[in-house]
């Protein structure tokens, strides 16, 4: 440790730390100090910027210095440049404080502390001050509890603050989620991990990148308690650990993983190592697993060392990569996975091959790289997901009742906070006072949630007081709802006051969306325009405005690509890119667009292809910043039309639900990200423009049991401009629907209108009906209800009753008027379960060996026959119901 002072002294004195200096210092300690010291030294060499490491120029205690070294040795490049040493030192101070003051602090080993308590970052969220704030709020609440009970208590605290609500892919910071009072699963789990770490409890976010049995993904939390890792649903407290709504779903998972900060040497299988994190496989914590060994060979049967091997699961109508490994010197890789079907796709130097693998049956797999960019063809693939397994921990009725009471109280705490947001009338009065569009102002303030004061202050201070006043509402109007919930006053002021005026030849909507707009992609918004107005001369600004292609040339020549130190592809602030002149490819594109907009040039990242582009005289031009070009449209593109022969209840297949299109670039499929509402009729019926190259069309029909009838079609788009036709084929299930169980149609439920018991038969009449048992305020039920609403028209056309049973009349009254339960099909009838009799009957008659996971949905008839059953987390429920209904007729 003493000899490290040589290095820190050099940094503190501002001595240039070049490679020769590093070699001189490192040679002194390599034989006696740790990997951490070596990695820290290598990091200094890689960055070659004294300013970044200025935090080490001030005196620190040894434990603080070691923790700071650990963070700086492994943090991704954007975290190194975008946040100050003072910020990290405060986080280190509070981490050590929690370790000293919390009763379990001394029992946490160094490995678990360094990797699962100390790191600030959880996922790809914006970093904030939550470590200090959460510690001060939680310490008295948990310090007299056992470590096990403290984990449960912290989750109850999180539930007081946040409940589930889906949103876009950008991850809110923990404090932003608290301010908003809701978040998606990735944000809820980020919040819980941050809160647990704040009180010194090791925690990590666990992801299934994609489920195997339904179209979605999920994130939750594992907490280390007295030597063992336990899991829990974030902001969804249960009476005990290792119990969550996703127990059954996780038992059907193909892959669950987590990324551990730094060089981790724990007992779990390592999926990959980068300079910043170690990715580990935790699938065996949740599901039965088997090993698969894949050998990659060329056409002649010789091993292909270094080949990339991707393990892909069917989800959202594409084969999504769960894990990517590199073949060893014998051309082999090994991976532990859940026992279901998976696609193995291997490539090397432009050649590729693929094979479906049934994990648990196929232990040794051979993939031949026998395809090139000229290959075309198609095949049908039947996908079978893992079977449900596992048991829930036992919970007494008293524990359940006590937990339900706590949840109700926590809902009231959160709802009391939400009630402080301005109501519609106060929003309307505010808009009238400013003499602005009432409907637009009300929409903006509603969307901003707990950030409403920021928007009100911004509008009040600027409307009528600046020449840019006319652009205030357009500026707010182009922001996403999530942006409105966490945007700062500084950002709004910067982009209003420092964006160049709209040119006369530029339409207002182009100016608002692609010049004024602070949002480029998925980055955290910053007030960067004033910075670039200052650092770029008027002469340079005028030149680039006239020659935007030259700004693209400057970026290519002057901003180097670092493909090593940002493996998570976090977004670096544009100002930091300017200062360092080095970043990853994605951040360079954001930088190009951000500075272009600061210059008054309309620019964007194409939402379909990911290509950085600038606008000139009504045409979008590529900036040429992409290392791998997956552009789907360009000058001279081919108009590709797809014919489709409709199947029953599927007149217009949906992108991401029934089909996707990828461009195969250097042997690897790259998904084309068309809008979420794209369909066959809007995209392929009349044709989509595709640049020349090789493409992969995937279609799939999700079955009621989670299986998939999929088809892969690889085709070539020629170089010469012309039209071509392909076929969009949706496979159909063969045979009639089978009876899978029984449900007595005379079973009773509580009728809410008459306040008496009523039979299913008396409500549904003769024939088929849908019955659902729901659990309001849970993510699986919220998804199911949204799916029913999405299929409202077709379900109403069917005309049969849909009976939704709530756990109690109180639960019905508290939830039926909420937004998520609005606009349901007119055929829906709501009631109350009576003593769990219906669910117990279903479990018995369907021979289920574990407790039912809500929500439960069945299609049954008046002859007591059940032909469809689903439980727990299911995406696409409405589509599944309609698929079965179509077969019934």
Q: How would you name each of these model-derived features?
A:
Residues 218-220, 825-828, 843-858:
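Structural micro-motif
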Residues 127-139, 158-190, 528-531, 556-584:
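Short, conserved helix/loop micro-motifs enriched in His/Cys and acidic residues
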